């Protein structure tokens, strides 16, 4: 069981900022920006390469919800970045697909 499943089951506390039937968003405990939220499906999708065509609707709704989450957290106007890390070289540390929403400061390009 991943840490995200434990958070979804309320076995581990988290600052949840948004929740729907099949995904939720919470503040990252090790933020990399003033606003750093993880948007996570409640069921495990083991990384982006573990997604299947049937996941498209869920993943699309997670992306669409990011604009509401950004608005709620006060970064919709100034701007925010969405990131999906996939694999060790990208920094993926939990084998459960999730989207990082980062904002509250200027983001450099290229990242990393």
Q: What residues fall within each predicted segment?
A:
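HIT superfamily nucleotide-processing domains
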Residues: 1-112
